[in-house]
Amino acid sequence: MNVGYTALDDVHFFSSGFDEKELTGRFTTEYGGRHLDVFPINHRLRYLMPFAEPQKTIDYLKTFKGEDSVLVMADDGEKFGLWSGTHELVYTRGWLEKLFGLLEKNSSWLSTARFSDCLAAPSKGLAYLPTTSYHELSQWSLPHEKSRKLAALWEGSAEDIRPLLRGGYFRN
C-alpha cells in the first residue's frame, strides 16, 4: 500500500526545532528512500475549535493573512457533539453555524481545502520527526509524581520553551 501524505500534531515538528510560524504547509519526510508528505496539525486551532468563539479562530487565522499558508485543523470528531456539553455548544448555541458564516464572510482572503488540494504546492522542506505525541498524552503516560512535576514545569515555563519539554512515551 502506498501512502502519499498524512497529518501529525505540530508537537512532532516542535520537537525537531521548528517554530509555529514555519508550519504553514506540508513537509516531506523520508526513510530509506521512501518519501511521505506530512501536514502539521495546528495545536492552536485544535484548542480554539469549538471551545472559543468562532471569531477567535478567524482572528488567529488573520495572523497568517497575506501569506501563502496552509493551516490544518484535524481533531477527534467527538469534540463536535459527543463530549459532554459539546452538542449544545456546537449545534444548539450555533457555534458551527457562526463559524461557517465567518468563513463565508472572510472568503476574500480565507479558503478551506482538502489535503489533496494542497499537494500541488511545493513541500516546505525536509523534516525528520521524532516519535512523540501531543503534550497532554506525554504527560499522562508518566507515573503520577513525574506527571505532576512535568505539569508544574510546563506551567512555569515560557511559551517558547514549552515545545522543548517532553514527557513519557505514549505506549506506556
Where are these regions (language model features)?
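Short acidic/polar capping segments at secondary-structure boundaries
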Residues: 11-12, 43-45
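A Trp-anchored, charged/polar loop motif used as the substrate-binding/catalytic surface
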Residues: 46-65
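Short helix/loop capping segments that flank catalytic or ligand/cofactor-binding pockets
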Residues: 15-16, 47-49, 81-83
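Short, glycine/acidic-rich beta->alpha junctions
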Residues: 1, 53-56, 91-95
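Acidic, His- and aromatic-enriched active-site or binding-groove loops in soluble protein domains
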Residues: 2-34
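Active-site and substrate-binding clefts of carbohydrate-active enzymes
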Residues: 23-36, 40-44, 62-172
